[in-house]
């Protein structure tokens, strides 16, 4: 079988890439060793955020991706429950408020909409917030989707345009003509292709290894608590503590927790967020879960009387410099990457897929991909450990 593009991975990034590549006229096959959205995409909160990003390439990509969600994909938003709910970042001290204000200055210059929120205004946004909080910032562009629905429907739309999706099909190696990648070997046979896109999420480093190139994507474990359903709009926005921004940008391998609380269309409340680098350890951390619950109650005291009905975990695809890997790999011509988005992959998926499709067909990309270059990392033997 021969196609224009093989996409490795059927999570949200792979699905978005397949969708936009199909729209661009490419013949596409998606191969996935498990099920659609069976990895990190099944364990995310569905964040489409600008609020948690400092000015720089990732924020530029987030703003671009917002445009793709709201324009290119607007007609399909109901399929994946796109909700432009806005994000409220809160601080417990005046010093924390000052830090939020300083961050907002640079975000506004980049194009982010931010409203300063005083202590007295916080109840107007969230009536159940703890009264001792010092202030915050509101980000009307923040939104939420259901990531498993995103992946499923984007792939359905891609199939309607002629793409093929092969689940339970594992990539075991690459086909080559000299140094050039010309396809993949899979558990179901070989597929030749003009290009192969590594969109394998947390497992993208392993796919890169098969091609003989180093892309340092590492798993960063996180837990989410889910509560019993509450009345509609009990919690109106995505609400998180100011220290969450620092945790997102941190490279620390140790456990970090900062409260993130938001409601869903079904009434349940999602509580995060923890980060730790423990490999692919799927054991439940009572410490992490207990800390998340305590910090969520500190933000919303009414949650003390609410039952948690389940918890789940996932692995964010972490890169050491906190930027995703997007674009062609000059070390292995024919190999492309769209991975390493860490906790921002849901929100950044739409923009990533559109940019990849533009580059694949030789169009100028709407955003400069240089900061996301796959070969920006030192060789594996030189990388810090």
Language-model regions, residue ranges each:
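Beta1/beta-strand and adjacent pyrophosphate-binding region of the FAD-binding site
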Residues: 1-13, 29
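Short hydrophobic core segments
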Residues: 6-8, 191-203, 207, 353
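Active-site substrate-recognition segment that forms the wall
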Residues: 19-23, 46-48, 80-83, 180, ...
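Glycine-rich FAD pyrophosphate-binding loop
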Residues: 22-42
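Dinucleotide-binding Rossmann-like beta1-alpha1 core, especially the glycine-rich loop
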Residues: 45-125, 258, 296
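Short beta-strand to alpha-helix junction loop
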Residues: 60, 89-99, 138-156, 283-288, ...
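Helical element adjacent to the flavin cofactor pocket in flavoenzyme catalytic cores
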Residues: 137-194
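C-terminal catalytic lobe of FAD-dependent flavoproteins
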Residues: 147, 281-385
């Amino acid at each position: 079988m021969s196609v224009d593009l093989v996409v490795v991975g059927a999570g949200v990034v792979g699905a978005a890439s397949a969708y936009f590549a199909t729209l661009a006229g490419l013949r596409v096959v998606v191969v996935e060793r498990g099920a659609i959205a069976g990895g990190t995409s099944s364990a995310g909160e569905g964040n489409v955020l600008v609020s948690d990003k400092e000015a720089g390439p990732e924020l530029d990509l987030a703003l671009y991706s917002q445009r793709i969600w709201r324009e290119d994909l607007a007609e399909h938003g109901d399929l994946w429950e796109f909700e432009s709910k806005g994000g409220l970042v809160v601080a417990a001290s005046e010093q924390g408020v000052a830090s939020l204000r300083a961050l907002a200055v640079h975000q506004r210059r980049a194009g982010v909409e931010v409203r300063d929120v005083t202590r007295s205004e916080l109840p107007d946004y969230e009536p159940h917030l703890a009264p001792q909080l010092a202030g915050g910032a509101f980000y009307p562009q923040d939104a939420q989707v259901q990531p498993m629905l995103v992946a499923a429907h984007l792939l359905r739309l891609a199939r309607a345009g002629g793409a093929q999706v092969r689940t339970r099909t594992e990539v075991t190696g690459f086909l080559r003509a000299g140094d050039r990648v010309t396809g993949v070997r899979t558990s179901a046979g070989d597929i030749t292709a003009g290009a192969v896109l590594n969109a394998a999420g947390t497992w993208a480093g392993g796919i890169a290894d098969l091609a003989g190139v180093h892309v340092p994507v590492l798993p960063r474990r996180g837990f989410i608590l889910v509560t019993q359903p509450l009345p509609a709009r009990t919690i109106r926005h995505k609400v998180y503590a100011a220290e969450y921004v620092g945790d997102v940008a941190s490279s620390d391998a140790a456990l970090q927790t900062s409260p993130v609380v938001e409601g869903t269309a079904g009434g349940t409340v999602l509580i995060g967020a923890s980060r730790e680098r423990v490999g692919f350890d799927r054991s439940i951390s009572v410490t992490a879960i207990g800390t998340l619950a305590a910090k969520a109650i500190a933000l919303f005291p009414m949650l003390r009387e609410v039952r948690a009905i389940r918890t789940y975990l996932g692995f964010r695809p972490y890169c050491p410099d906190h930027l995703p890997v997007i674009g062609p790999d000059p070390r292995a011509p024919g190999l492309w990457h769209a991975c390493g988005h860490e906790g921002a992959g849901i929100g950044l998926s739409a923009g990533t897929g559109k940019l990849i499709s533009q580059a694949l067909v030789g169009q100028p990309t709407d955003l400069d991909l240089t900061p996301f270059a796959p070969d920006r990392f030192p060789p594996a033997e030189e990388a810090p450990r």
